[in-house]
């Protein structure tokens, strides 16, 4: 059986047992912000396990998972992977231990026809809870007791945490044959690789209390997990997932691209790293994640760059990973349409990151080589952080290269340097939001509220809870704090749009609302400043600021107009990568392989403003998610939408979708007609990161304000320049040309003064061992002038090496230039000077520059001669 057949057989088997087939959830956990990635099948079912969602009783999934704790091990072991698929069947207060065990055995031995002699199991032997006699007796119906092993808490007892749901588990092991330690006593407790756990069945039947006692749960659950990769290994009778059909197509194509056979150890590791990391990268990008230096984006960047470095070590000179995307699509695109639908986009993102990294690698490796030469046993964390911060050079690569050179990396001091840098930029709000989350999670089930802001801008509401500015729940509040209401017209910050502001009022007081946010999916939290006393349980009048809402709505609908215009002008490569919408400005981030031309940008804003002039209706409807494809709606890559979802159509009604200007799935607030936008103005456009660009603009009332401010500034400039508004650009260009000519004349005069020996300049000519040296101390010269002087002198002295320096406080800057007829290496001389004078230097054979501490000038010249 191939992997597709095995995956389908698992889902179909448990469907026949009454389980609902549930699609894989996103790799980005939607209901648990504490997780970086989805790493188990049960993550999407937390509410079902806790009894909060009773819509499902039995379920079966094939869940996409990413685990990144062992990235450095991938490629060097038979088992480690970063992306994997977890097959799982679940019960929420429905079937329990006997059925779970019987069905697992039936599936493995009858559906897959795995020989029973290949299978072993383990049960919980007892400890904090009693021995799992039930599981033991159920397994005895299928296996002799010699094949049932009893293990402790570490292997066979699952807990959610120090308290809460927990229970014993039973693991199923597959015997891969006598290829491990070959010890006659080898069994499932041996880590030689012969016995591999393929399925874990968790029996969640207890609740652990604060005092450590364990009591039965009222709802007993089943949570199982079986790695598809390991199961396919067993079915295809191979020793590693990299030998299964989940990887072999990618590895075979990688062999061609890397021009290696994969027969020696280093080549095998490279192929495994490349095939694993490209697979993970494709899935992550299909979820809307982009390479960055933080969070999930950093993991993605790390995977791409690690694969690239090993490709480079194999001899590759340029980007190659993006060429493997089509192989991943061929094998997984049918099962996971988010890959097939975004194949070109994924390839473009990876190629852009590859191009950026090859530049980074060249610069970073050169600097790292200098650091390695100066390091004895350990590379300092400060140096590693310098490479990371300045060149984007991953610390993991620094560590791997250092180890290959026999050096260690001081990871502790690296983390310290990184932490200090983060402390400088960390906002109090980021830390405070974590505190909010912890408090609200404890009481969220009693705080469900309703958003009515699409239909109303004011309403009567009941105060559910109030919290003070320290985020402590109180009965009454005066001054700053927070409130949750039973219903609210306040749009909470989300989807790139800033939250509403407005006010609460009641008989004896009022509260200004500065913003609303949504820390959990069912809670809108209002930040308030109370005059009087706001009481829990009280009835209040709630109203948003209508002008602020109108300005924000104009900017948000303008973003939709720009998005559609970009897609039409630039093409399919455009995908939304982020957005920010407030009352005063909008920002739109989009993917693009190249910068748009000025003509393209002009066309984009012309299209958007034509849509404004045509006074298109803007219609919003809640519709089934499946309508998105039917109607041609634009969706965000990787976004997990509710079903039903909110559709925003510009230019037509839903009965005539072919007439539309644009259609997106969006939960934000919008104008009713594009004429309310008035105009859309570009403020600036530029690169945000590799392959991602940003447009900043204004629309509506904010655009009018922007035009007023700029007209006022232009009028003031016209007055200063003594010209008309219309002639300001020409007059400014004329002034700039005059300034440029004056600067050029000043630079020429300065060079003449410097080379003429005035102003403290000292020029010296020496010949040592047949090598001609021209040295100069150019007081007051800037770095650009140093280079110009060196170039000028090298033309006059074609067989010399030129050294020019300038002192600035306690530091000396210098350049070294090798004239055409000289055989002295400028970079070697510069680094030698820096090394002897507590400095640093770099460059190439013909030109180098550096800095060092100030010493006596004659001592400096003496050092040059010693080095030559």
UniProtKB/Swiss-Prot annotation:
Positions bound to Zn(2+) = 556, 560, 666, 670
**Matches recorded under InterPro entries:** aa-tRNA-synth_II/BPL/LPL, Ala-tRNA-lgiase_IIc, Ala-tRNA-ligase_IIc_anticod-bd, Ala-tRNA-synth_IIc_core, Ala-tRNA-synth_IIc_N, Ala-tRNA_ligase, Ala_tRNA_ligase_euk/bac, DHHA1_dom
Q: What is known of its domains?
A: Consists of three domains; the N-terminal catalytic domain, the editing domain and the C-terminal C-Ala domain. The editing domain removes incorrectly charged amino acids, while the C-Ala domain, along with tRNA(Ala), serves as a bridge to cooperatively bring together the editing and aminoacylation centers thus stimulating deacylation of misacylated tRNAs.
MF-aspect GO terms? alanine-tRNA ligase activity; aminoacyl-tRNA deacylase activity; ATP binding; tRNA binding; zinc ion binding
| Record-listed E.C. numbers | 6.1.1.7
Q: Which reaction does it catalyse?
A: tRNA(Ala) + L-alanine + ATP = L-alanyl-tRNA(Ala) + AMP + diphosphate
- Where do the coiled-coil regions begin and end? none
Q: Where in the cell is it found?
A: Cytoplasm
According to the UniProt record, one GO cellular component term is:
cytosol
Q: Which cofactor does it need?
A: Zn(2+)
Its family?
Answer: Belongs to the class-II aminoacyl-tRNA synthetase family.
Q: What is this protein called?
A: Alanine--tRNA ligase
| Species annotation | Elusimicrobium minutum (strain Pei191)
Question: Cofactor binding mode, per the note?
Answer: Binds 1 zinc ion per subunit.
* Biological role stated in the UniProt entry: Catalyzes the attachment of alanine to tRNA(Ala) in a two-step reaction: alanine is first activated by ATP to form Ala-AMP and then transferred to the acceptor end of tRNA(Ala). Also edits incorrectly charged Ser-tRNA(Ala) and Gly-tRNA(Ala) via its editing domain.
Alphabetical keyword list: Aminoacyl-tRNA synthetase, ATP-binding, Cytoplasm, Ligase, Metal-binding, Nucleotide-binding, Protein biosynthesis, RNA-binding, tRNA-binding, Zinc
Q: Record's SUPFAM superfamilies?
A: Class II aaRS and biotin synthetases, Putative anticodon-binding domain of alanyl-tRNA synthetase (AlaRS), ThrRS/AlaRS common domain, Translation proteins
Can you supply a Gene Ontology BP term from the record?
Answer: alanyl-tRNA aminoacylation
